[in-house]
């Protein structure tokens, strides 16, 4: 199958990026190196091409749109204000995830769902399957370009670029702005644990934005960042990734995103199983693990208790550039998922000591804008 290309594809190649297939797209995995890009984002700022993500617009009668969205997601849409972004999940009939998403509320009759690159077609089809009432669903991804500007200096860079104070955009909020003759969406969100923005524009303006931000960001230490460092950054922040910590079988509670699960007056898809997990606790759940012996955690390594009983497996793993040790996420039987519990990870036939760590591995600058 031929890989899709973002509007920045030729620019990535000109910049010397190493390209890899990802979710059906040909994407940059690194430019100068994963560690350098990771540390630059933590210390200064990084710019990411995320225009492979999907944008789905849900519009129609206010009551019908709200009822529909509430019926297919596990977080509470009704509490959202205009200009707010919400982390949520589209759920299936058995309580698993079709995808984790961000929901943007423009007004009572218009919402946007941002979904993962590999899942936005599945999300669109799932929404169309259950749509009812006066509601329209439009997968408008081909007309939108998305750039993420992340890091403690992201605000200063984008403020200088726009010539506009951005302090009014709070964490998990967005504003529509007129820029270069078109409406763009500026959202204070991200996938790194750092302060920053996700910026939605037309494809043409997205290319211009990329070039100009890199130029104006030179004095701030801004660097282009590929998918490799995007993954290590999200893992340090303990953000889940679909196909690793999230899938069609595990409930959001099992996947470690219990905080987005809400009880509602009308049940949503998979409601009984999801709420039972929230109330009674799941049999297994995703937590962080830190390796205490030499080695590097990767996905699907079996994990054992001290008595030799197999209790779970890793779902993601890496060598953390910030902490200079191997960190990972894992699904463990709940009794072993408590903070500082000692477990053993099997790496190449050897069982190595590790400890469970709850909470983020690295606390980035995102906390400064809560």
Curated annotation (Swiss-Prot):
<dbReference type="InterPro" id="IPR022903">
    <property type="entry name" value="GCS_T_bac"/>
</dbReference>
<comment type="subunit">
    <text>The glycine cleavage system is composed of four proteins: P, T, L and H.</text>
</comment>
<dbReference type="InterPro" id="IPR029043">
    <property type="entry name" value="GcvT/YgfZ_C"/>
</dbReference>
<dbReference type="InterPro" id="IPR006223">
    <property type="entry name" value="GCS_T"/>
</dbReference>
<keyword id="KW-0808">Transferase</keyword>
<dbReference type="GO" id="GO:0004047">
    <property type="term" value="F:aminomethyltransferase activity"/>
</dbReference>
<comment type="function">
    <text>The glycine cleavage system catalyzes the degradation of glycine.</text>
</comment>
<dbReference type="InterPro" id="IPR013977">
    <property type="entry name" value="GCST_C"/>
</dbReference>
<dbReference type="GO" id="GO:0005960">
    <property type="term" value="C:glycine cleavage complex"/>
</dbReference>
<dbReference type="InterPro" id="IPR028896">
    <property type="entry name" value="GcvT/YgfZ/DmdA"/>
</dbReference>
<dbReference type="Pfam" id="PF08669">
    <property type="entry name" value="GCV_T_C"/>
</dbReference>
<dbReference type="Pfam" id="PF01571">
    <property type="entry name" value="GCV_T"/>
</dbReference>
<dbReference type="GO" id="GO:0008483">
    <property type="term" value="F:transaminase activity"/>
</dbReference>
<protein>
    <recommendedName>
        <fullName>Aminomethyltransferase</fullName>
        <ecNumber>2.1.2.10</ecNumber>
    </recommendedName>
</protein>
<comment type="similarity">
    <text>Belongs to the GcvT family.</text>
</comment>
<dbReference type="GO" id="GO:0005829">
    <property type="term" value="C:cytosol"/>
</dbReference>
<keyword id="KW-0032">Aminotransferase</keyword>
<dbReference type="GO" id="GO:0019464">
    <property type="term" value="P:glycine decarboxylation via glycine cleavage system"/>
</dbReference>
<dbReference type="InterPro" id="IPR027266">
    <property type="entry name" value="TrmE/GcvT_dom1"/>
</dbReference>
<dbReference type="InterPro" id="IPR006222">
    <property type="entry name" value="GCV_T_N"/>
</dbReference>
